[in-house]
Amino acid sequence: MTNKLQVSKRELRPRSLRTKLRKEGKALGVVYGYKVDSTPIVFDEMDLRKILRDHGDNALIELHYDGNKINTLVHGSETDPFTNFYQHVEFMAVKMDEETEVEADIVLVGDAKGVKEGGYLAQSLYKVTVAATPANIPERIELDVSELGIGDSVTVADLPEEKSYKIVSEPDMHIASVNEPVAEVEEEESEEGSTEEEASEGASEETEESTEDKE
């Protein structure tokens, strides 16, 4: 599916005019890359937001301006920390038959057996680097964790891989694991502490008895 975004060329205008454009719901940006000279642009912020919301950050976006159609990926962006409004977006023009490396979201699916047994699922890696042609970049990669028991874990090597893309990240990178319930861990540590304390007390009593015998 082609995601079309209508944009207009813009001049490098005074800050006051850029502020006015933002108040009108316009976002500023720049497009550069394959067969494209760096060109400042302006577009409706909501149009881009809808594309990225529906198709993910790696969506292939076809920019339309001055009769041109340019296939691009979002290469970087700046957002307002309070409103999340896109203040500036970098679009990278891409060659459709050439692979590029991007980060894809890792989404865990399924209810882990270990969680049903009282454990909890902890995820440490949320994105993985993949290489693919622009049209084949995955929106996300799902990993089924339903068979994970307490103490089990998954790494990048466990991610499903399709012919349309290649996973570039190191295969031994840890993604998630099912850990023991915190209460049980604390109880075991408490029991270990009690055992050590009892052993220490026993050794102390034996030392005292030995001293008394000598006297």
From Swiss-Prot:
| Signal sequence segment | none
Name it. Large ribosomal subunit protein bL25
Q: Which organism is it from?
A: Exiguobacterium sp. (strain ATCC BAA-1283 / AT1b)
* Encoding gene (name): rplY
User: Which GO biological process annotations does it have?
Assistant: translation
Chain intervals with Acidic residues compositional bias: 183-215
The protein's role, per its UniProt record: This is one of the proteins that binds to the 5S RNA in the ribosome where it forms part of the central protuberance.
One GO CC annotation = cytosolic large ribosomal subunit
State the oligomer form and interacting partners: Part of the 50S ribosomal subunit; part of the 5S rRNA/L5/L18/L25 subcomplex. Contacts the 5S rRNA. Binds to the 5S rRNA independently of L5 and L18.
Q: Which GO terms describe its molecular function?
A: 5S rRNA binding; structural constituent of ribosome
What keywords would UniProt list here?
A: Ribonucleoprotein, Ribosomal protein, RNA-binding, rRNA-binding
Family as reported in the entry's similarity comment:
Belongs to the bacterial ribosomal protein bL25 family. CTC subfamily.
Is the keyword Membrane assigned to this protein? no
Q: What NCBIfam families does UniProt report for this protein, alphabetically?
A: bL25_bact_ctc (TIGR00731), PRK05618.2-4 (NF004133)
Traced from the root, the source organism's taxonomic lineage reads: Bacteria, Bacillati, Bacillota, Bacilli, Bacillales
- Record InterPro entries: Rbsml_bL25/Gln-tRNA_synth_N, Ribosomal_bL25/Gln-tRNA_synth, Ribosomal_bL25_b-dom, Ribosomal_bL25_C, Ribosomal_bL25_long, Ribosomal_L25_dom, Ribosomal_uL5_bac-type
> Where do the record's region annotations for Disordered lie?
171-215
Q: Which SUPFAM superfamilies match?
A: Ribosomal protein L25-like
Which PANTHER family is this protein grouped with? Answer: RIBOSOMAL PROTEIN L25/GLN-TRNA SYNTHETASE, ANTI-CODON-BINDING DOMAIN-CONTAINING PROTEIN, RIBOSOMAL PROTEIN L25_GLN-TRNA SYNTHETASE, ANTI-CODON-BINDING DOMAIN-CONTAINING PROTEIN
